[in-house]
């Protein structure tokens, strides 16, 4: 087991234990493990099921790492995801952990922010086949297909006498 130098948002792993990745650390690179996605509704009001995470967790591997979702140009990549783990030890807390490798010589400021803890959060982007609305079940392939509930994502509605928040179920 090579040493992981930094963990992004270790507080956000809850009671879950970060995995032990097997990898060969290269000189001059920073290795960062992070919780990439959980089987819950996230702060962007997107939800991923445990089944979807189990099906797709390996698709993180060999994907580029970007800053602030600047992912249109591969030249803006700041690293690569070299491994991933699916965690289902606690059925109430299913999640995917990733291991990122970043070149400290090429991106010294970014790596220093991670090392110092100044940068301690991350966001995950993905491509979806479609999403469904948590309120009405509308299936959307593009933003043009969104129902009013998703257009006002995060709003609350009374459904069968219960208050329910609108979010996207990602598929």
Segments from the language model and where they lie:
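Signature of dsDNA virion morphogenesis modules
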Residues: 1-171
